[in-house]
Regions:
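Active-site metal-coordination/substrate-binding segment of hydrolases
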Residues: 68-134, 158-159, 366, 372
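Short beta-strand segments
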Residues: 72-74, 136-138, 166-170, 194-196, ...
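A structural signal for isolated positions on well-ordered beta-strands in alpha/beta enzyme cores
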Residues: 43, 70, 134-136, 295
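Acidic-glycine-rich active-site phosphate/pyrophosphate-binding loop
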Residues: 80-96, 167, 184-194, 318-319
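Acidic/histidine-rich catalytic neighborhood of metal-dependent amide-processing enzymes
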Residues: 108-184
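N-terminal helical capping/dimerization or prosegment-like subdomains
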Residues: 1-81, 257-261, 275-278, 367, ...
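Metal-dependent amide/peptide-bond hydrolase catalytic core
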Residues: 2, 29, 172-176, 183, ...
């Protein structure tokens, strides 16, 4: 007889893995071991781009028929920070005052444990699965995210694997379980700008071309740029200047270069290409005005995306509302997540634990919330496959 899995004990086992990106420390194996007990076929995928660490990923699946309901998550975690500030061992899996405390418990080992426990309860009552259940688990989400979900999705598309719907276990709730479902995310583009002037003595500015003056004007212009007013699904796009660097050690020298970095979070009224065009126009015109040159380097973390609310989204919303007595908001706020890669193969939403303590000292999840999330995931499966 199939034994069910306890979400708290599994979450505790995962927390005990010191899986700070890019280290795995056995976390993926623990996930696979528990899934194999439930009858899942586990496929490990390892990827390594030049200059990056090798990352182990897992795609596990039970059933061969359609539809395929997928859960996506990551076992890697951020560093613990100041160890002395923690009240417990961050990798001890300590349960104290009905809270499981440890790095990554909310972001997002707890969600992974809850979904696996939910599947175990679902399969115990549904021996004949009318479809497939899969899990996509990566160890590369918290940092550069190049050898994780992105590569797995590319491989699955290449193999013509079909995923009909995916739920990502990100901690979407700010204070209480049930507050928010993410149905999309803004895109993200980072720019590194260099203004090239002419170095000289401050007493002879006519013989120089001060890049500091130019970059100040450029940054003022891009900061004042009104990209849009937002729409019913997204808040307005936003640009923030993150770095200004003038590498000059002398007070009486006009520098040769001035550098700055910025980030744009943009909604679905734009693409990264259209954002680049708007910014490049400002860089070009301002540099021309001052008879200077510029260099710009961009990094696109992801495009904006939106999962239009459909029958499955509303079903998930109703399951959460019934369990928590909170009517969850369908939101597109926040930073980027691996959902930006998953959208290429499947519609997806994000729902998990509470984000209040993630990346902080004494990150924690309430035992009651772990049980409640497990029940939510289980009921989503019952409703999806009925």
């Amino acid at each position: 007889m199939l034994k069910t899995i306890n979400e708290v004990f599994l979450a505790r086992d995962l927390v005990r893995c010191k899986s700070v990106t890019p280290k795995d420390d056995g976390a993926i194996n623990i996930v696979a071991k528990n899934l194999k007990k439930l009858g899942f076929k586990c496929q490990f995928m390892e990827f390594k781009e030049k200059g990056t660490p090798q990352i182990r990923n897992l795609y596990a699946k039970i059933g061969k028929a359609s539809p395929n309901f997928c859960f996506a998550g990551h076992t890697d975690v951020v560093p613990v920070g100041d160890l002395k500030s923690w009240t417990v061992n961050p990798f001890g899996g300590v349960i104290k005052n009905q809270k499981l405390i440890g790095r990554g418990v909310s972001d997002m080992k707890g969600s992974i444990a809850c979904f696996i426990a939910a599947v175990s309860e679902f399969l115990k009552k549904n021996k004949k699965l009318n479809g497939s259940i899969s899990l996509l688990i990566t160890g590369d989400e918290e940092t550069i995210a190049v050898n994780g979900t992105k590569k797995v999705i590319e491989k699955l598309i290449q193999k013509k694997e079909k995923i009909n719907f995916c739920i990502v276990g990100e901690p979407t709730n700010e204070n209480k379980l049930g507050e928010m479902i993410k149905i999309g995310r803004r895109g993200s583009i980072t720019g590194h700008l260099t203004i090239i002037g002419i170095q000289g003595h401050v007493a002879y500015p006519h013989s120089s071309n001060n890049p500091s003056t130019i970059i100040v004007e450029v940054l003022n212009k891009i900061k004042k740029l009104k990209l849009d007013k937002g729409n019913k699904d997204f808040e307005p796009s936003n640009l923030e200047i993150t770095k200004i660097n003038i590498d000059n050690t002398a007070d009486n020298v006009i520098p040769a270069e001035a550098k700055a970095s910025f980030n744009v979070r943009f909604n679905n009224l734009h693409t990264s290409i259209s954002i680049k065009k708007k910014l490049n126009k400002i860089f070009s015109s301002t540099s021309k005005k001052f008879k200077a040159n510029y260099k710009i380097r961009y990094h696109v973390s992801g495009e904006s995306f939106l999962t239009k609310p459909n029958k499955t989204v509303y079903m998930i919303k109703n399951v959460i509302k019934k369990s928590t007595r909170i009517n969850p908001v369908l939101s597109t706020t926040g930073g980027t997540s691996d959902a930006r890669f998953i959208k290429k193969i499947s519609p997806c939403v994000e729902f998990g634990l509470i984000a209040k303590t993630i990346h902080q000292v004494d990150e924690m999840a309430r035992v009651a919330d772990l049980k409640k999330l497990k029940n939510i995931y289980r009921d989503i499966l019952f409703n999806y496959f009925k």
